[in-house]
Amino acid sequence: DVTGVQTCALPISEYSSTKRLTIESNFYRHFCDIMLESIKSMGMTKKQILKRYEFKNQSIVYDLLKKNKSIVLLMGHYSNFEWAMSVGHYLDNVKGVGIYTPITNKYFEKLMQKVRKRHKGYLLSRYKVHDYMKSEEEKNNLNIYGFATDQSPRPTEKTYWRKFLNVNVPFFTGGERIANKYEYSIVFGLAKRVKRGYYTFNIFGTTKKTDHPYDRSEEHTSELQ
């Protein structure tokens, strides 16, 4: 097993052990905050979450939607990514849909769905993505589909490998492949902590620059790192 100290040592090996321990301690403190904030979101009102989670660069989204095509949002599990479910509060006539793997515990599955819907966020099983998107296309509905790219996929011929924090790891490329299939625009999302319990959520546009099959996944991974 890789401990927090070992993980911290990988990308910043030049740091002293004391500084690494400080970084590790700060991480766990922030991680605990995120856990508590996730629980808090169950009872937060729209006004409360909008006060604490400000969606920046909305104009990028609206400009891309003028193409009359949905958008793929690539994100990582960084900062308070959970509250990104609230972006639907900011956008008119657009649904925020998070792609996820359903959990086996029916109680927590139902709770997770309920909390997302409370803040105009919706969850879509990764096993139903194509059927849902085809249906939405036929209805001319525009959505923002969120994909977390920093999971640990099973290695297959479609898996994209690259160095991340000095370790060669696999990344999900489903978001980019789906965007290419349906001709959707791709944007990056990044939450930044302003102070304890307060965040900004920034959207960054992207364009395909090369013939590399996972050009934008590479760009997003570099930004996330």
Positions of predicted regions on the chain:
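Hydrophobic alpha-helix position signal
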Residues: 9-11, 116
